[in-house]
Amino acid sequence: MKIYWAFDLISPYAYLGLKQMPRLPAGTEVELVPTLFGVVLNHHGQLGPAEIGPKRRFTYRFVVWRARQMGVPFRMPPVHPFNCLNAMRLVAAVGSSHEVVETAFDFVFGQGRDVTDPAVLAELGQVLGIPDVNAALNDPAVKQALRASTEWSIQRGVFGVPTYIAGDELFWGHDAFDMLVDYLRDPQGFDDEAMRRVDSLPVGVTRSRVTHP
């Protein structure tokens, strides 16, 4: 089965999620879709996890713990969140293959490099095999491709990264990986009475959105 994986290099959860892909059932084809998280957040009117103080601290501590548990190298970059638009453009410029995306994630979260530094960004470009980084960053076709892939994800219902898209189903977050595996092995198990009931559960109360200082 072909599935899709929406990602942004800003997400440490996406880095950890990428490391789980070898556990996918045999025969699963994955297309990696560059998706600008900030654009997704703006579309849905959401805050990112790093924009809520206590959640930010928990998130960073959790990913450090989880990386240790998984046995994968992990180092947060010097600042987070950070502007990763240019790094995402470099990934989009060379096609977003699994090898390319894993190389970029290893650079950011395996080594903890600061891709907002122009010299470090140029180094990432070299690692990805881009001969002219500035040309790639300013290529209208690259910019349009990244906009289009982000919009594609939004149209499929993506509200966060990483997200797997399998048919009409979304599996958000690296911690939904086992749920995805179960779905790929037995899709009918996700169409029983309990699942259908929660799909149509009525809303009991809504609240006004409050902007906090």
Segment roles from a protein language model:
Residues K2, I10-T28, F105-P213:
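C-terminal cap of thioredoxin/glutaredoxin-like
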